[in-house]
């Protein structure tokens, strides 16, 4: 074997996936790159290693830096990192080349897939928890008739809008396969339109919350003048023509992929996104005025109605940024940095999926009227069952002495 070193090199190159002919061409190319360099003294000659990296002619004692190979042995590598090789003091190259920084792009793709799958799990978990919490809140508002004022009816409708949005989200996730996207069938476009409609209703019912508080606190109108049908028109009615206009625009200008996403240069999605941003900004203005009034005029007031207004404002102050932040995140570019993209994906997935949970907590579970009504129901149920127990015991008391006396009489008769 020692007589055939060239044969060993050919076998090594073939094992590494390199053609011996191409290797000789690489040597010639590497030599040509080194011709322009003017180096005096002891030096290492231009050389191509077994991986195929060209190490140009370099002075002795220098650590030479070269980009990682773009492709080796069927695997792509990140060329932004470097490999290192030392030109020894005796004018020969070090046998070992440091490729420790060279990372497989395949690994980076695997990491991206892992983050994507985790984000999907967060989305499913958040929407499940939100849907359960929203359904519980819906049932509470349905059963507790004693608290049915206009303010709580608005809360109830907001919760209903979130339930329908979460439900259509699950329909989208379970039915929209890549094949369905490509086919662009009619039913999948209807599902997308329904999801976007309920998405818009979320914002318009939040707008209804802001309108109610602004009218009651800032404009100091009596809430008795406000009618339920006004808010139903705002929350359920106004979004409908907006989505119809969007659907017509999609049908004529972007009729593909079940109306999800958008083509470059086509702005039909702004037909419904624009009104959402507008009502969001108006709500911020409403809240600014409401907080200003509460901080000045109503600070000293301790009436129960004012306390309820304050609690409603606190809930809206928390929920509105949650709704707004998640929506505005779609317009933010997370950048090319991996950490930024991962934080963006997880943060957006969490807020997007847990919105319904936060709505049910702040507008129902922490609502003092709801909690008070539940306590009354619970005490009434306890009293009812305790009365039944007392009545049952009272009815059983007379029978016991009768049996005893009859038994004693029977015994005395027998004697």
Curated annotation (Swiss-Prot):
GO terms for cellular component: endosome; neuron projection; plasma membrane. Glycans are attached at residues 38, 78, 98. Residues 143-149, 219-225, 296-306, 369-415 are cytoplasmic. Disulfide bonds join 30-54, 44-87, 68-102, 188-258. Residues 280-290 are annotated as: Important for antagonist binding. Residues 99-108 are annotated as: Important for peptide agonist binding. The chain crosses the membrane at residues 112-142, 150-174, 190-218, 226-253, 270-295, 307-331, 339-368. This is Corticotropin-releasing factor receptor 1. It comes from Macaca mulatta.
């Amino acid at each position: 074997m020692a007589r055939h070193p060239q044969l060993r090199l050919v076998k090594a190159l073939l094992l590494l996936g390199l053609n011996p002919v191409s290797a000789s061409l690489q040597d010639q190319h590497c030599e040509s790159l080194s011709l322009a360099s003017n180096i005096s003294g002891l030096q290492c000659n231009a050389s191509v290693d077994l991986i195929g990296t060209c190490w140009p002619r370099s002075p002795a004692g220098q650590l030479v830096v070269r980009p990682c190979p773009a492709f080796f042995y069927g695997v792509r590598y990140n060329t932004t990192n470097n490999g290192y090789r030392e030109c020894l003091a005796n004018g020969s190259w070090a046998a070992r080349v440091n490729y420790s920084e060279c990372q497989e792009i395949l690994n980076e793709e695997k990491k991206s897939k892992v983050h994507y799958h985790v984000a999907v799990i967060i989305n499913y978990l958040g929407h499940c928890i939100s849907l359960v919490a929203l359904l519980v809140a819906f049932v509470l508002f349905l059963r507790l008739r004693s608290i049915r004022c206009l303010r709580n009816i608005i809360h109830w409708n907001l919760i209903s809008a979130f339930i329908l949005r979460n439900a259509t989200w699950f329909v989208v996730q379970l039915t929209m396969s890549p094949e369905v996207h490509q086919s662009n069938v009619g039913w999948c476009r209807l599902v997308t339109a329904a999801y976007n409609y309920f998405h818009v209703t979320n914002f318009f019912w939040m707008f209804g919350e802001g309108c109610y508080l602004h009218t009651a606190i800032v404009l100091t109108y009596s809430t008795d003048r406000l009618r339920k049908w006004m808010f139903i028109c705002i929350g359920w009615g106004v979004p409908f023509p907006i989505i119809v206009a969007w659907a017509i625009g999609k049908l004529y200008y972007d009729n593909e992929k079940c109306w999800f996403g958008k083509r470059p240069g086509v702005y039909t999605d702004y037909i419904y996104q624009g009104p959402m941003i507008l009502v969001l900004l108006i709500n911020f203005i409403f809240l600014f005025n409401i907080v200003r009034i509460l901080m000045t005029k109503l600070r000293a007031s301790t009436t129960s109605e004012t306390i309820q207004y304050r609690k409603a404002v606190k809930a809206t102050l928390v929920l509105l940024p949650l709704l707004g932040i998640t929506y505005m995140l779609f317009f933010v570019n997370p950048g090319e940095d991996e950490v930024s993209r991962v934080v963006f994906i997880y943060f957006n997935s969490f807020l997007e999926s847990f919105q319904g949970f936060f709505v049910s907590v702040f507008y129902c579970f922490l609502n003092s009227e709801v909690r008070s009504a539940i306590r009354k129901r619970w005490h009434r149920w306890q009293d009812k069952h305790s009365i039944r127990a007392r009545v049952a015991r009272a009815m059983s008391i007379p029978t016991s002495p009768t049996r005893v006396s009859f038994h004693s009489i029977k015994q005395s008769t027998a004697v």
